[in-house]
């Protein structure tokens, strides 16, 4: 069973993330940041992962710590659920459009954290959500899941559409990379023999 539950408890946040990599897209979120909940739902539904994330944070200051720490905790949960990564595809990619917006996401469960984020949003906020926090979410995930992640917003006039295509593509790319590869069942997907 490729499942994990991780709790992160700091002076800034308390977060619990549950993930089932072989789920069906069931989702439950209560992070205190409504737009983040909406984006997490994209990951669950387009990745076909069952995700349950609960967070309490110092949102009276701003949403930064909560958004970043949700990324950290979700990354830890993915790393734990994947274990030694034996038998997975390892690489995943997706292009996702939403009206005028188009984004590309490529992921490698390499064990080497690296975020390559090329997004120029058309405005600084989506409702009350600071678009800079999307990068903080992905940086937290990358550092704690041990993945190399390339995110490119190829076009878009609407910042909400840009962000949503990124999170949808991220879910689809994760799904592809985390899928079991029946042709390489039981093998570590690396010539090194370890990831």
From Swiss-Prot:
Subcellular compartments: Cytoplasm
Catalytic activity: D-erythro-1-(imidazol-4-yl)glycerol 3-phosphate = 3-(imidazol-4-yl)-2-oxopropyl phosphate + H2O
The protein's Enzyme Commission number: 4.2.1.19
Keyword match Lyase: yes
Record GO cellular component, one term: cytoplasm
Record-linked PROSITE patterns: IGP_DEHYDRATASE_1, IGP_DEHYDRATASE_2
Family matches, as SUPFAM superfamilies: Ribosomal protein S5 domain 2-like (SSF54211)
Pathway: Amino-acid biosynthesis; L-histidine biosynthesis; L-histidine from 5-phospho-alpha-D-ribose 1-diphosphate: step 6/9
Keywords: Amino-acid biosynthesis, Cytoplasm, Histidine biosynthesis, Lyase
GO BP, one annotated term: L-histidine biosynthetic process
Protein name: Imidazoleglycerol-phosphate dehydratase
Species annotation: Aromatoleum aromaticum (strain DSM 19018 / LMG 30748 / EbN1) (Azoarcus sp. (strain EbN1))
Gene designation: hisB
